[in-house]
Structure formats: C-alpha cells, structure tokens
C-alpha cells in the first residue's frame, strides 16, 4: 500500500519505507521509524520533534549551544544532528536528573489530556525554543503558566543522533 497519510501508515503498516526525493530514507517498523529515526528527515516526517546541531565531546556526550549533555547513542561524527521528541522532555522537580536546563514557558496549548509547551531554553551560548508535551493534569495542578520559569531534563536515552 502507498500512502502519504502518516496516521494511516503508522496504524496499518507492519513495515514502512519512507522515501525522500525518490530515495529510501529509512525502512522499518512504525515504532522504529518514530522512536529510532536515522535521519533528520525521518524524525521530522513522522510526528513533531526538536532538532539541534551538536558537537561531539566524547562517545556519549555532546555540546548543544555551549551546553554539555549526556547522550546514550554512540556518537561517531564530530558534528551531528540530535533529535528529541516533545514527550521525552520532562520538567525537573528535584534537579537530580541528567541534562538539566533552565527555561521560560512562552506558550501553552491545551490539547485535552495533554498540553504542548513552547519553552525558551537557556543553553549556555544562546536561547532556543523547544517543544514539549506534558500531561494537562500536571501543568494545571502545579500552576504552570506562560512566563513560568522551569527546569527541564533532556533525558540521555531520548537524545537520538541522526544524519542531517
């Protein structure tokens, strides 16, 4: 079956072949295409994601806009692209999580059981907008609003190194 409908492809397919300009970009199960993208195109094509240019610091650490972050992927190239899905970014309550960054809520979009947050994150060398998904109940119960200061965690297992 050939389709351009992402939802249809994810729900009906056992395997997906994702093509970009007539070339196979990635092939795999719907879960692999979503959670283990191999390229920035794949990550952006299925769902929403955050993409960052990153410099290799070691085989498991990267620098994004001057901030050093742990990453569970084995980093091979000196410069790469890193993706993280909005639902994998967590608000840090204790500060004990890895990869903690401070930011300011710029916009909250109520989507029913979820709220999409647009956060201006303070990396060391610049501020960057990041998209996050949170449970509505958590945001409402903790009185998090536009212009609230938050600490977020970019969890190491969720940072995926992809080809540009």
Q: Residue spans of the language-model regions?
A:
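Catalytic metal- and UDP-sugar-binding loop of GT-A-like glycosyltransferases, i.e.
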Residues: 18-19, 84
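Residues located in well-ordered beta-strands
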Residues: 29, 41, 53-55, 102-106
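Hydrophobic Walker B segment
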Residues: 10-13, 45
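Non-catalytic connector elements of ABC transporters
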Residues: 49, 60-164
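Short, glycine/charged-rich "phosphate-handling" switch motifs in NTP-dependent
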Residues: 15, 27, 36
């Amino acid at each position: 079956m050939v389709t351009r409908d992402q939802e249809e492809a994810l729900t009906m397919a056992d395997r997906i072949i994702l093509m970009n300009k007539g070339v196979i970009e990635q092939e795999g199960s719907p879960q692999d295409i979503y959670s283990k993208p191999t390229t920035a195109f794949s990550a952006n094509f299925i769902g929403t994601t955050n993409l960052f240019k990153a410099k290799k610091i070691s085989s498991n650490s990267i620098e994004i806009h001057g901030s050093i972050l742990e990453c569970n992927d084995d980093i091979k190239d000196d410069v790469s692209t890193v993706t993280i899905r909005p639902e994998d970014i967590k608000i840090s309550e204790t500060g004990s999580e890895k990869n903690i960054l401070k930011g300011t809520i710029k916009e909250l979009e109520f989507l029913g059981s979820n709220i999409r947050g647009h956060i201006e994150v303070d990396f060391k060398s610049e501020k960057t907008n990041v998209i996050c998904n949170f449970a509505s109940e958590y945001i409402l119960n903790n009185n998090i609003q536009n212009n609230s200061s938050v600490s977020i965690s970019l969890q190491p297992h969720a940072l995926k190194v992809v080809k540009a």
